[in-house]
Swiss-Prot record:
GO CC term (a single one): extracellular region
Protein's cellular compartments: Secreted
The keyword Secreted belongs to this UniProt entry's keyword annotation: yes
Record-listed Glutamic acid 1-amide modification sites: E27
Protein name: Cupiennin-3d
Annotated organism of origin: Cupiennius salei (American wandering spider)
Highest taxon above the source species: Eukaryota
GO molecular function: toxin activity
Cited Pfam families: Cu
Amino acid sequence: GFGALFKFLAKKVAKTVAKQVAKKQME
């Protein structure tokens, strides 16, 4: 259903944001 899709997208976004934050902290 829609809930599963939303959870999947939320996980993807969280991973991407985590990567961006890690990059900024390394600089």
